[in-house]
């Protein structure tokens, strides 16, 4: 599984993110660190993952539903394939729980 070119920077990000969540400051931290376009891209990736895990639509339909490129859908699909199945099941449960 590919994580980051610079693991020290990635770990520093994860640690400050953990701290922000523990102190209920995640919104402010992510707003500081991510541009509006980057926040939109993260939201889009979450929608892509949700629809891919739902398995109701083809990748082409997801592309059309979300008005994005085939390459963007493929990147999401490829990343899912690199993750442990148990983790992806957990992600699906979290996403399904948000629908309720």
Language-model region placement:
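General nucleic-acid-binding
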Residues: 1-20
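Short, Lys/Arg-enriched anionic-surface-contact patches
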Residues: 26-45
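Short, solvent-exposed alpha-helical "recognition" segments
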Residues: 78-91
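Short alpha-helical "recognition helix" segments of helix-turn-helix
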Residues: 60-69
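Short, amphipathic alpha-helical "recognition" segments used to contact nucleic acids or chromatin
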Residues: 42-57
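Intrinsically disordered, low-complexity basic tails/linkers immediately adjacent to helix-turn-helix/homeobox/MYB/SANT
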Residues: 90-100
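The DNA-recognition helices of helix-turn-helix-type DNA-binding domains
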Residues: 55, 69, 80-81, 94
